[in-house]
């Protein structure tokens, strides 16, 4: 992305994936923050949603999103949500959507499932993050788009709603945020 002028092209529907990833700590944090803020500016200026990736950087991500919202509104999605409650609450407070991947189906993801139970359907998306993070029962395999069904089935059961409701609402949310 060279700048917000790149966003006016007809085929661009979002800015990102962008954000902070401190997990491996191989990219200088200062540079990540600078790039994240530039992408937020592009989102704000273009009106296109921001697709946010955050890993091992919950506090900093929330601080930046709050600060930047104070400079002017922008919308977005927390992509492949697998982090803490603070990120979910901040995102929802700022009008963002939260996208869930196969991680929610993993045996060790109970703390994530507790948060997901509280995410309103009107702010939820379902994704694959292919080729990574295949849901149970495909865990360990290369993820593919068809497996999104397994994630959606799991989320429907978790939230006590029909599968069709998850699919319908996630689809509607996709069009609201990304196709607008």
Region spans (language model):
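Short, small-residue-biased leader/transition segments that mark boundaries at the very start
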Residues: 1-8
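His/Asp/Glu-enriched short active-site or ligand-binding loop at hydrolase and phosphoryl-transfer sites
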Residues: 95-109
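Conserved beta/loop motifs at nucleotide-recognition and modification sites
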Residues: 129
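Short, conserved catalytic or interaction motifs in soluble domains
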Residues: 121, 135, 156
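Divalent metal-binding pocket/active-site signature
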Residues: 9-94, 106, 114-115, 119, ...
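Mid-to-C-terminal alpha-helical segments outside catalytic/metal-binding sites
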Residues: 148-180
């Amino acid at each position: 992305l060279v700048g917000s002028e790149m966003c006016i092209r007809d085929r661009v529907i979002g800015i990102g994936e962008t954000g902070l990833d401190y997990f491996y700590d191989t990219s200088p944090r200062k540079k990540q923050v600078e790039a994240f803020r530039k992408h937020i500016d592009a989102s704000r200026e273009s009106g296109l949603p921001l697709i946010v990736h955050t890993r091992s950087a919950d506090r900093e991500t929330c601080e930046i999103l709050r600060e930047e919202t104070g400079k002017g509104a922008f919308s977005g999605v927390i992509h492949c949500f697998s982090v803490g409650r603070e990120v979910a609450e901040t995102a929802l407070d700022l009008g963002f959507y939260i996208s869930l991947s196969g991680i929610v189906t993993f045996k060790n993801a109970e703390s994530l499932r507790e948060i997901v139970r509280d995410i309103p359907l009107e702010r939820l998306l379902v994704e694959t993050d292919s080729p990574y993070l295949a849901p149970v029962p495909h865990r360990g395999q290369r993820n593919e788009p068809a497996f999104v069904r397994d994630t959606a089935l799991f989320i429907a059961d978790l939230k006590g709603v029909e599968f069709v409701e998850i699919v319908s609402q996630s689809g509607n949310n996709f069009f609201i945020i990304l196709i607008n």
